[in-house]
Every structure is written in C-alpha cells, then in structure tokens.
Amino acid sequence: MDAISDPLIRDCVVMAGAQVGKTEMLLNVIGFHVGQDPAPMLVVQPTLEMAQSFSKDRLAPMLRDTPNLKGKVKDPRARDANNTTTHKVFPGGHVSLVGSNSPSGLASRPIRIVLCDEVDRYPASAGSEGDPVQLARKRSATFWNRKIVMVSTPTNKGASRIENAFEESDKRFYYVPCPDCHHEQKLKWSNVQWEKDKPETACYVCEECGSAWDDPKRYRAVRLGKWKATDEFKGVAGFHISGIYSSWTPLADAVRDFLSAKKMPETLRVWTNVYLAETWEDQGERVDDYAVAERA
C-alpha cells in the first residue's frame, strides 16, 4: 500500500504465488480510494464472469462489512442506487469491473486507477483492438496522478506479461531475518529440506548459519521482513513473492504438492507458476532444477 500511494511510483507490478494476499491487496487499494481518496477506478479481470465473481464474492462483502466504507456504495437493489454488479458509484468516484476480452469495457470513460488482475490469463488481444493492458492504460492518460497496478502469477518464459513488466521494474524482493543469526535473505525453494519420503519433516534452512526453521519460526521471520529493491528505480515498483512466504501453506503441504507435481511436466509447470511464482521453461531436464538436499 505504501507503493500504491507513493506519487513517485507510476506503475506497481506484483508477481506473486498463491495464498500471499494478492486479492487482499487489490481490495485494499479499492477500499482506500472509496474511503480516503475518491477516484474513478477500473478493475480488469481475465473474463467478465471472473469480474462478476470478484464483485459478488470479494468486493461487495468488503464494502458492506467495513465500517468506514459501509453506506458509501448503495446496494444495487436500491431504487436510486445507480449501481450494478460491475459498476459501483460512490461520492467522488466509481469503480467499474470488466473482462480483458471486452474491447468496449476497456475503451470508455477516463480512469485514474487501473487494477489489472491475473494479467497472464489475458488474451493477446481484446477482440481486434490490441493488448488489453495497453488499452486499459490509455484510459488513465489524462490524469497526472494515475496509477497502474498489474498483479499475476506467471506462466511461460518469454510469454509472461507479469514477468516482462517485473523485469522493467526495480525488482523488489522480500528479505527476512534468520531468527538465530539475523542474516537477511530471500526465501528459496532450494533451502526447503526434508527427510526422504517424510514431507512432514520439512523445514526451512538458513542460508547463512544452517539453522532449521519450523513453520511458526518461519512465520515469525516473515513478519519481521522488509522489501529491498535490487535494480534502479525508473517509476515502476516491482514486487516478487512466492508461496514459501505464505502463512496459509505449511511447508509439509508444499513438499507434498511438489513431490506429486514433479511426476509430470504439466503438473510441475503449474506448481512452479502458482507456488514459486516463477515462469516455466520447457526443458527436458527441468526437474533437475528442483534438486533439494534431503536430510536424513
């Protein structure tokens, strides 16, 4: 949220795994602009059906249950609401929700805040109009304080919108301190270790001192972490975070998923994209990239 509200940052790019708060981040941005900094907003989902589902299942409950937002957006069923599932008006602004495959939804009124969710699932072109992200971006051209937010799990190397955007950013990674030696480090799958055929023994091993972190220890370390940029800032803030940081997924479950996924390239590809938040390269020896030291 600090990056979203920073006037020096033009674009925010979030390349992330599952269960690390991507959707909550988007909801927080919407809530902030509904309650504190009213603006016209556009939320782009891969399809209209996904936009409707996001509105009903996530956005509407937040607007209804958050005290500071309650009442700012009228119930669509009210006679004077002027609201629908995919278009909600509030004092000083509105939020529209569209599918990336809809040229008309991407080419109407000016928008200051553009939120593009799961951009790697967008089609190459919205009808015959061109790239959906660029169409949405053009909607914000008249605002000096515009903000473009792109969020996604990645897909294939060379064809991933989110990876390409991340490569143009300042490439921020989340560094956590070891609870024992305090060395700050990115969490890597190569440092997840377990006894052979015993996923329940999985732990994270500090790259500096070798101490083993169980899940509670890992959760505490993550809470003390901080983002660090690894490249020059040129107006685009990029964030990468994998499922290893998630407090919702025990490492034992992650190891079980990995052991099951590595049996076939297609399932390993999905695991790589969704858990590690990394793009997939079609290589016959891809499984070798995940060689993990197993402790006896």
Could you say what each language-model-derived stretch is?
Residues 1-296:
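Phosphate/NTP-binding elements of NTP-utilizing enzymes
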